[in-house]
Amino acid sequence: MNGYEAYMKELAQQMRAELTDNGFTSLETSDDVNQYMQNIDNDDTTFVVINSTCGCAAGLARPAAVAVAEQNEVKPDHKVTVFAGQDKEATQTMRDYIQQVPSSPSYALFKGQHLVHFIPREHIEGRDINDIAMDLKDAFDDNCQ
């Protein structure tokens, strides 16, 4: 591993911890993603954060995801994350389940293996964090019972 890769791995670990320290399960391999998705109960909801090292992930996506997942009255059954640019195979496998244009950071909400809501980067970047949180709240309220 060269110096740049080592630096990015260390930096990404802190960014990953912002989610895992708040109850998100990190899926770091393609097998992790497939095992999770293939074994999820059809009635369970899963909130997926596709994490990223960019500024909008740090200042908007991760804080909004954590706040709403912890504070909203209606919560998904499960919270998972993959890290774009770091866990490339895991991210691609999750994107195969999502079946939307690749976007990071982004959010996906599943019921079983069925995608019920998706928020791409362009609906995160440049927006007020409270607006993003309200989008997540509405998605949880509509789909997580």
From Swiss-Prot:
<protein>
    <recommendedName>
        <fullName>Bacilliredoxin SERP1006</fullName>
    </recommendedName>
</protein>
<comment type="similarity">
    <text>Belongs to the bacilliredoxin family.</text>
</comment>
<dbReference type="Pfam" id="PF06491">
    <property type="entry name" value="Disulph_isomer"/>
</dbReference>
<dbReference type="GO" id="GO:0045454">
    <property type="term" value="P:cell redox homeostasis"/>
</dbReference>
<dbReference type="InterPro" id="IPR009474">
    <property type="entry name" value="BrxB/BrxA"/>
</dbReference>
